[in-house]
From Swiss-Prot:
InterPro entries assigned: Frog_antimicrobial_propeptide (IPR004275), FSAP (IPR016322)
Region of interest: Disordered: 24-46
Maturation-removed propeptide residues: 23-46
Signal peptide start and end residues: 1-22
Entry's family note: Belongs to the frog skin active peptide (FSAP) family. Brevinin subfamily.
Biased composition (Acidic residues): 30-42
Name used for this protein in its record: Preprofallaxidin-1
Length: 67
């Protein structure tokens, strides 16, 4: 009976350790995905900011054409 308890506790302990490791890896993967999404968003913003002066220039020429 005592060896059965020890075996059961060992199995439960190893299960908890493996579950903990899996959760940690899952969180790390989620953090990496969030960082990639943030990088993509900042790249999109930079693209918009570089395009904005060109649009303003075209609108300015349409409103006040050069003489």
């Amino acid at each position: 009976m005592a060896s059965l308890k020890k075996s059961l506790f060992l199995v439960l302990f190893l299960g908890m350790v493996s579950l903990s490791i899996c959760d940690k890896e899952k969180r790390e993967g989620e953090n990496e995905e969030e960082e990639e999404e943030h990088e993509e968003e900042s790249e999109e913003k930079r693209g918009l900011l570089s395009f904005l002066p060109k649009v303003i220039g075209v609108i300015g020429h349409l409103i006040h054409p050069p003489s």
